[in-house]
């Protein structure tokens, strides 16, 4: 942890070298989800409900997903840009260092500008929690926390898959963005509105529904089964096959010679 904090300090100092550029980039990141949220707002000006969900419930859903994604994107950016590390030979240096490869890639890049999305998500989450009639109890508080943390782990797993694919393609594959940016965009609404097929895929293949749809149903009072609180914890198991795929890629890595 001490070494990680040292890396974080280095990245902060690097970002602060050009403060105006950093603040403008963070501001731009703030407006990206804001425009998406306006789209949701305009739709609810025309339709009062979507698949039985109100504006505040959808806003709560979007805020939780956006916060998870923004934190994962901020701290796991090294895996999202891993194809560059492969291409320029930087990963060769990682392999000869006496630290775990995942840890070193994790520390290689942190896009602190992405905290702009996180700020927007926090404001939206506070507003949604104030306006959504939730019958609060300890289990629902833990559900909210687990949804955010589980979402971070889930997005981190997808980034690991992306990085693992880079060992075999040498370049990133754009289709993986369906599982990162796509999950963030689809996360604006509860997954049930996309149909049974999507909900099934996001339950058993990529367990996105376990950190979004099912615990959300308990959080907003659609049912009172407190076991839904544990679903985001179960979804965290997804990181295990993702890590194994990454290790498989490391074992088959061949240097580019750069």
Q: What is the role of each PLM region?
A:
Residues 1-258:
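Hydrophobic transmembrane alpha-helices and immediately adjacent juxtamembrane helices
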């Amino acid at each position: 942890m001490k070494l990680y904090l040292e890396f974080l300090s280095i990245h902060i100092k690097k970002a602060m070298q050009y403060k105006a550029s950093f603040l403008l980039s963070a501001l731009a990141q703030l407006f990206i989800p804001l425009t998406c949220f306006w789209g949701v707002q305009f739709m609810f000006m025309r339709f009062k409900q979507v698949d039985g969900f109100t504006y505040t419930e959808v806003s709560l859903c979007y805020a939780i997903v956006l916060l998870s994604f923004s934190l994962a994107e901020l701290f796991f950016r090294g895996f999202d840009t891993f194809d560059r590390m492969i291409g320029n030979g930087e990963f060769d240096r990682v392999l000869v260092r006496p630290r775990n490869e995942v840890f070193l890639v994790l520390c290689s890049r942190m896009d602190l500008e992405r905290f702009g999305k996180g700020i927007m998500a926090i404001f939206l989450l506070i507003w949604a929690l104030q306006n959504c009639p939730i019958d609060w109890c300890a289990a629902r508080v833990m559900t909210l926390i687990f949804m955010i943390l589980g979402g971070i782990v889930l997005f981190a797993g997808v980034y690991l898959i992306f990085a693992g694919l880079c060992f075999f393609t040498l370049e990133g594959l754009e289709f993986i963005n369906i599982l990162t940016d796509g999950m963030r965009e689809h996360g604006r609404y509860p997954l049930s509105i996309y149909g049974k097929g999507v909900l099934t895929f996001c339950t058993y293949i990529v367990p996105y529904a376990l950190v979004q749809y099912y615990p959300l149903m308990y959080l907003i009072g659609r049912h009172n089964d407190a076991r839904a609180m544990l679903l985001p914890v179960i979804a965290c198991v997804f990181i295990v096959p993702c890590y194994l795929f990454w290790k498989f890629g490391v074992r088959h890595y061949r240097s580019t010679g750069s």
